[in-house]
Swiss-Prot record:
The primary structure of this cryptide Pep-4 is identical to that of cryptide Pep-4 from Tityus serrulatus (AC P85840). It comes from Tityus obscurus. It is found in: Secreted. The lineage of its organism: Eukaryota, Metazoa, Ecdysozoa, Arthropoda, Chelicerata. It comes from the Eukaryota. This is Cryptide Pep-4. Expressed by the venom gland.
Length: 11
Protein backbone atom coordinates (compact mmCIF):
# COMPACT_ATOMS: atom_id res chain seq x y z
CA UNK A 1 0.00 0.00 0.00
CA UNK A 2 1.99 2.91 1.32
CA UNK A 3 5.15 1.11 0.25
CA UNK A 4 3.99 1.24 -3.36
CA UNK A 5 2.05 4.46 -3.53
CA UNK A 6 1.84 4.02 -7.30
CA UNK A 7 -1.24 1.92 -7.89
CA UNK A 8 -3.14 3.64 -5.10
CA UNK A 9 -2.45 7.30 -5.71
CA UNK A 10 -1.22 6.96 -9.25
CA UNK A 11 1.17 9.76 -8.44
Amino acid sequence: NIALGQDQSGR
